[in-house]
């Protein structure tokens, strides 16, 4: 990635935009401009991906307010979900979406030797997070018990509270934000000698990494500790109850922060983090949570809805959560990585459902355009019939890429059992060629380094590519990604230039590049 070229483009765009004056008028300032003189080359996947990484990073950064960026109609550090201001209006900053966006920014920062422009964007995000935490809102305030107001899902781009009706609270946001910022502190220590980049700037609410830990990360973690066993709305903002995705990212945030708390001599809190993370791990895996359902042999995203017979429990969140909480090359105590048999079976069953559900998938034999969940009726601007989502499809590509990367990088054997058998046998390899007696066995182990292992690893990458081919076939000509693609025609629909869509594709390309770089 040639960051100098990319950021010079941003600077030119910024100079052409009007400065913000007076009260917020989100419709007065355009924040979308297509990547200069670019048109998607649909000739082949390799050609597309080689250029698209730079293009998707452009569109992601375009939706972040910071001095070197294009979007200036917001407090520095603000992430808009989309420039779309009507039909639908996504011109807000969501706690969850912002944190996930910055996890992608951190991936770029880590892969590019702590690029200081990206580091500044991250620190502006941390700064605006401090202010948002202390903005009273319909969910509560910072001074409430366990900082109740941190469960507020979204804010206006000027940092003021959004006071309209919404699904409140959403308990995944504080956890994801705590994890993202904690990960940045580790990057600062490992890649930049513990030095922040904005401490000499005005209007910054921290002067050290300890300030960030005590005043920004810790309050989010206290919220998680206080409310992890309370119901809230899911990541799709539609249903209140217990959610696999929410509990998983909460467990990740707590477990990840234990060592950080210890590094700042906060031993008692580290113990609380550790014990609560352990409780959450048991809750995720056990009968209390109800997420692992052996009757159906897959993860149930919302057990309450299954009990009410309103949903079967299949949901792309059951593989998005594992991907977000298990970065490549990271040692993690968080359960349910993508190699978990129940996660894989959930992934497989959703794929099988979506192949039949969405007419656009009739053109594909392997990967497919994937939606949020089978019962979805949100069409991008109202209710009728749900569509596939670009981000769900990009994350679907990441699953086999990560399976291949983890197995090859650690020289791990690949174990196939009765639960994940259908996925491997249908899409990756004919298991009868490996073990003719497999179906009478409990499992088969494919030894690392064997010819069969190399075949499976290569086929996993090919299978991941089949999802990116779907994206190539339906991405906008300018390389931007909407929220959805029409279930019949494949044309883009819903909010345009969705930040999360670009981020999910970026992460898929990153994973693909890393697994292909392995010998």
UniProtKB/Swiss-Prot annotation:
For this UniProt record, give its keywords in alphabetical order, as a comma-separated list: Carbohydrate metabolism, Glycoprotein, Glycosidase, Hydrolase, Polysaccharide degradation, Signal
InterPro entries recorded: 6-hairpin_glycosidase_sf, 6hp_glycosidase-like_sf, GH15-like, Glucoamylase, Glucoamylase_active_site
Query: Can you supply one Gene Ontology CC term for this chain's record?
Result: fungal-type vacuole
Spans traversing the lipid bilayer? none
Q: Which residues form the active site?
A: 234, 237
Q: Which residues bind substrate?
A: 166
Q: Does the keyword Cell inner membrane apply?
A: no
Enzyme Commission number: 3.2.1.3
Name the source's superkingdom: Eukaryota
* SUPFAM superfamilies linked to this entry: Six-hairpin glycosidases
Question: In the UniProt record, which residues carry a glycan?
Answer: 115, 127, 205
Question: What biological processes does GO assign it?
Answer: polysaccharide catabolic process
Please name the top-level EC class of this enzyme: hydrolase
Chemical reaction(s) catalysed: Hydrolysis of terminal (1->4)-linked alpha-D-glucose residues successively from non-reducing ends of the chains with release of beta-D-glucose
In alphabetical order, the GO MF annotations are:
glucan 1,4-alpha-glucosidase activity
Signal peptide range equals: 1-27
Question: PANTHER family, alphabetically?
Answer: GLUCOAMYLASE, INTRACELLULAR SPORULATION-SPECIFIC, TREHALASE
Concerning its family, UniProt says: Belongs to the glycosyl hydrolase 15 family.
By what name is this protein known? Glucoamylase GLU1
Q: Organism, per UniProt? A: Saccharomycopsis fibuligera
Supply the source organism's classification: Eukaryota, Fungi, Dikarya, Ascomycota, Saccharomycotina
């Amino acid at each position: 990635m040639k960051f100098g070229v990319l950021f010079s483009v941003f600077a030119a765009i910024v100079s052409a935009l009007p400065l913000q004056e007076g009260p917020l008028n989100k419709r007065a300032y355009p924040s979308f401009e297509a990547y200069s003189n670019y048109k998607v080359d649909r000739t082949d996947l390799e050609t597309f991906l080689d250029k698209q990484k730079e293009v998707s990073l452009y569109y992601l950064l375009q939706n972040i307010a910071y001095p070197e960026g294009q979007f200036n109609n917001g407090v520095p550090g603000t992430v808009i979900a989309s420039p779309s201001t009507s039909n639908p209006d996504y011109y807000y900053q969501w706690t969850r979406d912002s944190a996930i966006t910055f996890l992608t920014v951190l991936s770029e920062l880590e892969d590019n030797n702590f690029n200081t422009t990206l580091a500044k964007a991250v620190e502006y995000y941390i700064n605006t997070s401090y202010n948002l935490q202390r903005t009273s809102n319909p969910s509560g305030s910072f001074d409430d018990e366990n900082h109740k107001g941190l469960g507020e899902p979204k804010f206006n781009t000027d940092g003021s509270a959004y006071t309209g009706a919404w699904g409140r609270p959403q308990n995944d946001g504080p956890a994801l934000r705590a994890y993202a910022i904690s990960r940045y502190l580790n990057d600062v220590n490992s890649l930049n000698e513990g030095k922040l980049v904005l401490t000499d700037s005005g209007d910054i609410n921290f002067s050290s990494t300890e300030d960030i830990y005590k005043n920004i990360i810790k309050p989010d973690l206290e919220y998680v500790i206080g409310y992890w066993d309370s119901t809230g709305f899911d990541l799709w903002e539609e249903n209140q109850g217990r959610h696999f995705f929410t509990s998983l990212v909460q467990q990740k945030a707590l477990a990840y922060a234990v060592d950080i708390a210890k590094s700042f001599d906060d031993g008692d809190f580290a113990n609380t983090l550790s014990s609560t993370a352990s409780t959450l791990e048991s809750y995720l895996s056990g009968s209390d949570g109800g997420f692992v359902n052996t009757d159906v042999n897959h993860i149930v995203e919302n057990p309450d809805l299954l009990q009410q017979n309103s949903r079967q429990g299949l949901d792309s969140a059951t593989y998005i959560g594992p991907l977000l909480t298990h970065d490549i090359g990271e040692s993690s105590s968080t359960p349910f990585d993508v190699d978990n048999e129940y996660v894989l079976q959930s992934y497989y069953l959703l794929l099988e459902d979506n192949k039949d559900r969405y007419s656009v998938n009739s053109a594909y034999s392997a990967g497919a355009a994937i939606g949020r969940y089978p019962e979805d009726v949100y069409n991008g601007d109202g209710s009728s019939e749900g569509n596939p989502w670009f981000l769900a499809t990009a994350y679907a590509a990441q699953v086999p890429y990560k399976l291949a990367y983890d197995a090859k990088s650690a020289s791990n054997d690949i174990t196939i059992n009765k639960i994940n058998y259908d996925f491997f046998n249908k899409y990756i390899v004919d298991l009868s060629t490996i073990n003719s007696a497999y179906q009478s066995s409990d499992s088969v182990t494919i030894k690392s380094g064997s010819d069969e292992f190399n075949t499976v690893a290569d086929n996993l990458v090919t299978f991941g590519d089949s999802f990116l081919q779907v994206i190539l076939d339906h991405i906008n000509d300018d390389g931007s990604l909407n929220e959805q693609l029409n279930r019949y025609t494949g044309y883009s629909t819903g909010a345009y230039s969705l930040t999360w869509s670009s981020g999910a594709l970026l992460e898929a390309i990153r994973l693909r590049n890393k697994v292909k770089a392995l010998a």
